[in-house]
A protein has these predicted regions:
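Amphipathic, oligomerization/interface secondary-structure segments
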Residues: 178-184, 188-192, 232-233, 237-247, ...
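Generic amphipathic alpha-helical segments used as scaffolds and interaction surfaces in large
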Residues: 209, 220, 224, 237-240, ...
Length: 373
């Protein structure tokens, strides 16, 4: 059962930085913080969230250290409803493969978290809301006080969708916390935290580059995972209109991959990825089809935010800098769309690694599509 408490004054938000009496203050009315924010998260939790816990009746027997999840919503008069550690969380996810009813879901099955609902809870759009949630030892805090003064802006966005994005960020936090140095090392080696790889493989890959070692250490695992997923990949590009023009060609690339014919597999797949991107660009009515614009196509079509596990902004950068990499005609050293298309990539570059990455790029593009499931 929820608890009901009464604030003397309904909170409006958190002050962004200290000000002196009489000075104007910037108030944060909507925010998401997670464990990676360190003391910023601690300060928020030790403020209003702790005050709420302290207001609960003694029979609740709840301490701040015991909070797994907390949901609070309140009106402008300060009348609040509080739920602590009693709600069932229902997540709506986008999955990598078909799942049967009753089948267990594992982290590696999840492409993204689209919604996070709390069963039996309805939050009025004119109420402020604060939610604390956990994933193991990780904590997340989301609040939206914009329906209250000074904004007085009734909530129109889907609260559960917002929470889903936040929870997804928490679930895949290490992917969002990749350092600039690690990103540079991944791009230099042609790798990306592809959704087609298991989270454990990606974490291992990040660990290698953080230790100044080669991301190629994960190639045997990555190749095995892609090979195991080929039947699912064939189903994916068979069921979406964007891929309908390319299915036969992509199937041929998959056939050559299974046969270990790396020259044929790469010769097919690298030019074909651009064809797929051209189809994707039509979803957002892109007019200019330069390579830099095509690199934006998945992001523009998806409507995804930075919190997505697909890392859409970084994938755009990857497409532009790695897939569409330019080359020195006198010394073409890397396989890319352009080195393959211009016939200057060396035979050594038509490797198993390049074929693995090519198929992973196709899958990553697929899951940017709005109706991809």
């Amino acid at each position: 059962m929820p608890y009901h408490v009464k604030f003397k004054h309904a909170p409006s938000g958190y002050v962004a930085k200290s000000v002196k009496k009489g000075e104007s203050a910037t108030v944060i009315q909507k925010e998401f913080l997670s464990s990676e924010d360190g003391m910023a998260l601690v300060h928020r939790l030790e403020g209003f969230a702790t005050e709420v816990v302290d207001m609960l009746p003694k029979e609740a027997r709840v301490k701040s250290s015991q909070v797994d999840h907390l949901l609070l919503h309140f009106d402008r008069e300060g009348n609040a409803t509080v739920y602590v550690n009693e709600l069932a969380q229902i997540a709506s996810i986008k999955t990598r493969s078909d799942l049967a009813k009753g089948q267990a879901v594992f982290e590696h099955d999840i492409v993204d978290v689209e919604r996070l609902e709390y069963q039996g809870v309805s939050v009025p759009p004119d109420h402020g809301v604060l939610v604390v949630f956990s994933k193991g030892w990780r904590k997340g805090l989301y609040f939206d006080f914009e329906p209250l003064p000074p904004m007085d802006k009734e909530r129109v966005e889907d609260l559960w969708r917002s929470l889903g994005r936040c929870y997804g960020y928490l679930l895949f936090q290490e992917f969002h916390a990749i350092s600039e140095q690690a990103w540079a090392a991944l791009f230099a080696a042609k790798w990306f935290p592809f959704v087609g790889l298991k989270p454990t493989t990606i974490k291992e890959m990040i660990g290698w580059v953080n230790s100044a070692q080669s991301a190629d250490e994960v190639l045997p695992k990555a190749a095995e995972e892609v090979r195991a997923r080929l039947p699912s990949l064939r189903k994916l590009w068979a069921k979406h209109a964007v891929f309908s023009d390319h299915k036969v060609i992509l199937d041929a690339a998959a056939d050559r991959f299974e046969a270990g014919d790396w020259i044929a597999a790469n010769s097919i797949i690298y030019p074909r990825i651009e064809g797929v991107l051209r189809n994707v660009s039509k979803l957002s009515n892109q007019v200019r089809l330069t390579q830099s614009e095509l690199a934006k196509a998945p992001l523009l079509a998806s409507g995804l935010t930075r919190s997505s596990r697909l890392l859409p902004q970084m994938f755009q950068k990857y497409l532009q800098e790695v897939y569409f990499e330019t080359f020195d005609p006198k010394n073409p050293s890397n396989i890319s769309r352009n080195s393959v298309g211009h016939g200057v990539a060396s035979a050594d570059e038509f490797s198993e690694k390049a074929a693995v990455i090519g198929l992973l790029i196709v899958e990553q593009v697929f899951f940017h599509l709005p109706s991809a499931t």
